[in-house]
Swiss-Prot record:
Family matches, as PROSITE patterns: RIBOSOMAL_S12
UniProt subunit comment: Part of the 30S ribosomal subunit. Contacts proteins S8 and S17. May interact with IF1 in the 30S initiation complex.
Organism annotation: Myxococcus xanthus (strain DK1622)
Record family assignment: Belongs to the universal ribosomal protein uS12 family.
Any coiled-coil regions, as ranges: none
Name of the gene encoding the protein in the UniProt record: rpsL
Gene3D superfamilies: Nucleic acid-binding proteins
Name this polypeptide is given: Small ribosomal subunit protein uS12
Length: 123
């Protein structure tokens, strides 16, 4: 426990809060190019083949991001937009690809939560 004079001289060190999506550098979204599109298996109680992509962002950082929705058209060299938001059962996946922007098409036949998957209104 420091004395009062020690606190006057040095003060307390501020705790540094680490962000959840550091690669975005305080931006809401970032553009990037897919370097690899593949599937991964999730953590223990779950079982599936989750679609993910390695994306090199415009600021030079390479991140792993999740491709949401059923089916996608992404391949290597596709230009995509990423946003923050982790996938709980995929370790190291802290970003989502935004569907319906740039080279990523929206989910076909989607009727509910359309705005989250870039689907147009059914006519």
């Amino acid at each position: 426990m420091p004395t009062i004079s020690q606190l006057v001289r040095k003060g307390r060190e501020k705790l540094v809060v680490k962000g959840k999506s550091p690669a975005l550098k305080e931006s809401p979204q970032k553009r990037g190019v897919c370097t690899r599109v593949y599937t991964t298996t999730p953590k223990k109680p779950n079982s599936a083949l989750r679609k993910v992509a390695r994306v090199r962002l415009t600021n030079g950082i390479e991140v792993t991001s999740y491709i949401p929705g059923v089916g996608h058209n992404l391949q290597e060299h596709s230009v995509v937009m990423i946003r923050g938001g982790r996938v709980k059962d995929l370790p190291g996946v802290r970003y989502h690809i935004v569907r319906g922007t740039l080279d990523s098409v929206g989910v076909a036949g989607r009727k509910q939560s359309r705005s989250k998957y870039g689907a147009k209104r059914p006519s």
